[in-house]
């Protein structure tokens, strides 16, 4: 064990990729999951679209650099958490490893993450890229939800560490509610919610646009994103919140100042109702999406009710938040309150239906917030990949050569670090 280089942990999300070395508390880099390529596409030449000849093949950029290249086509290879374009993903990983981590892939084990309900074929593609193109000595593909549970251990005593819980993972492109029992995801009960960070940004953009506050149109999206990240919070009661702003606006309304990218002049806007209306679409999705009207607390309740009866109480007791879109102030508190109401109402109803003969035992609902929420998945990966067990459960290059990519279909659960 001694003298071995730390494993590389890479968590690829729809919006951002988090990368760094195991054992660290935070990722070294957080970059947008996009890649800028030169497209040579003429009409009808699909095959030649991006495989340029010779040295042009290296002419691409990823992350923040990719966004700044106007003469290149910017692509996002991951949609709703799942890789859609494997050619681009391979190029993306190439720069992640060599340019950002500056690692020699043959010397480091790798921990990559996968979304819930990822297909076994996708794991095989990942294994092929890592073992064939980068020649890594070992690879482990971890489920994001399990890592998020592990990350929540920072907020509890060692005796209470458990890999049973409900993970609410809300990123840029998709929100999942994932029940996990003893480190295994209960796949049949996963629900996904079509509302995530990007939808909140769009919704705030729309609110600002309706008010016509003088934002340059080409900057309206980044302004909405900045407003969301700086000023938004979750309120306990919509009507009261509106009243607060109407009676004492100066105390609540914030000023956002931006610089017009073209004229370089400053512009400033007032940020009012947007502050609490943005994140409110988690609890009232119909504000932004008329096709989906189920609040997040009801989705969580339904997920847990679908699970086997003997794990329901532990699932209510350990609801873990993960991902950037759960970072709004009081998000956890509001979710806990709404969920508690739903659960208590059900218990009360069952008591009434039994004519008072049944006294149900109250259910403990706990939503756990911790300071690692935003990079919970990466941090969980960093913790697990720095334990000695990690190297025993990794799939090695030798196994891969003997058996083939199918070994990566199954990755054993490990590390209830008791």
Swiss-Prot record:
The lineage of its organism: Eukaryota, Metazoa, Chordata, Craniata, Vertebrata. GO terms for molecular function: actin binding; ATP binding. The modification N6-acetyllysine is found at residues 240, 244, 251, 254. It is found in: Cytoplasm, Cytoskeleton; Cell projection; Nucleus. The modification N-acetylalanine is found at residue 2. This is Actin-related protein 3. GO terms for cellular component: Arp2/3 protein complex; cell projection; cytoplasm; cytosol; nucleus; site of double-strand break. It comes from the Eukaryota. Its main location: cytoplasm. GO terms for biological process: Arp2/3 complex-mediated actin nucleation; cilium assembly; positive regulation of lamellipodium assembly; positive regulation of transcription by RNA polymerase II. The gene is ACTR3. It comes from Bos taurus. Component of the Arp2/3 complex composed of ACTR2/ARP2, ACTR3/ARP3, ARPC1B/p41-ARC, ARPC2/p34-ARC, ARPC3/p21-ARC, ARPC4/p20-ARC and ARPC5/p16-ARC. Interacts with WHDC1. Interacts weakly with MEFV. Interacts with AVIL. Keywords: Acetylation, Actin-binding, ATP-binding, Cell projection, Cilium biogenesis/degradation, Cytoplasm, Cytoskeleton, Nucleotide-binding, Nucleus. PROSITE patterns: ACTINS_ACT_LIKE. SUPFAM superfamilies: Actin-like ATPase domain. ATP-binding component of the Arp2/3 complex, a multiprotein complex that mediates actin polymerization upon stimulation by nucleation-promoting factor (NPF). The Arp2/3 complex mediates the formation of branched actin networks in the cytoplasm, providing the force for cell motility. Seems to contact the pointed end of the daughter actin filament. In podocytes, required for the formation of lamellipodia downstream of AVIL and PLCE1 regulation. Belongs to the actin family. ARP3 subfamily. Pfam families: Actin.
């Amino acid at each position: 064990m001694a003298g071995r280089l730390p494993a590389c942990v890479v968590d690829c999300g729809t919006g951002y990729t988090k990368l760094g070395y195991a054992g660290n508390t935070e990722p070294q880099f957080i970059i947008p999951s996009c890649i800028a390529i030169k497209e040579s596409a003429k009409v009808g030449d699909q095959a030649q679209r991006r495989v340029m000849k010779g040295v042009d093949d290296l002419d691409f950029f990823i992350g923040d650099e990719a966004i700044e290249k106007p003469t290149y086509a910017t692509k996002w290879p991951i949609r709703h958490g799942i890789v859609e374009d494997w050619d681009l993903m391979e190029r993306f990983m190439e720069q992640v490893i060599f340019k950002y981590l500056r690692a020699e892939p043959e010397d480091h084990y790798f921990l990559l993450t996968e979304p819930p309900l990822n297909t076994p074929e996708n794991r095989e593609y990942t294994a092929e890229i890592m073992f064939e193109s980068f020649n890594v000595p070992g690879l482990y593909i971890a489920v994001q939800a399990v890592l998020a549970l592990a990350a929540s251990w920072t907020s509890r005593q060692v005796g209470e560490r458990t890999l049973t819980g409900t993970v609410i993972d809300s990123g840029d492109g998709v929100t999942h509610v994932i029940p996990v029992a003893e480190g295994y995801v209960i796949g049949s009960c996963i629900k996904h919610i079509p509302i995530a960070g990007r939808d909140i940004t769009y919704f705030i953009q729309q609110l600002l646009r309706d008010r016509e506050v003088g934002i340059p149109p080409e900057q309206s999206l980044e302004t909405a994103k900045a407003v969301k990240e700086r000023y938004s919070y979750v309120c306990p009661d919509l009507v009261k919140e509106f009243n607060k702003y109407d009676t004492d606006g100066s105390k609540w309304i914030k000023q956002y100042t931006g610089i017009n990218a073209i004229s370089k002049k400053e512009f400033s806007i007032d940020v009012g109702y947007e502050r609490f209306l943005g994140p409110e679409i988690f609890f009232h999705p119909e504000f932004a999406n008329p096709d989906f009207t189920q609040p997040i607390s009801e989705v969580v309740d339904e997920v847990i009710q679908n699970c086997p009866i003997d794990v329901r109480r532990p699932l209510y007791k350990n609801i873990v938040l993960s991902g950037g879109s759960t970072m709004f102030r009081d998000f956890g508190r509001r979710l806990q309150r709404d969920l508690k109401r739903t659960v208590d109402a059900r218990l009360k109803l069952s008591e009434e239906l039994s004519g008072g003969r049944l006294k149900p035992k109250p259910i403990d609902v706990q939503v756990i917030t911790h300071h690692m929420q935003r990079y919970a998945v990466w941090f969980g990966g960093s913790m697990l990949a720095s334990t000695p067990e990690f190297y025993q459960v990794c799939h090695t290059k030798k196994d891969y050569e003997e058996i083939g990519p199918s070994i990566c279909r199954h990755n054993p659960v490990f590390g209830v670090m008791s």
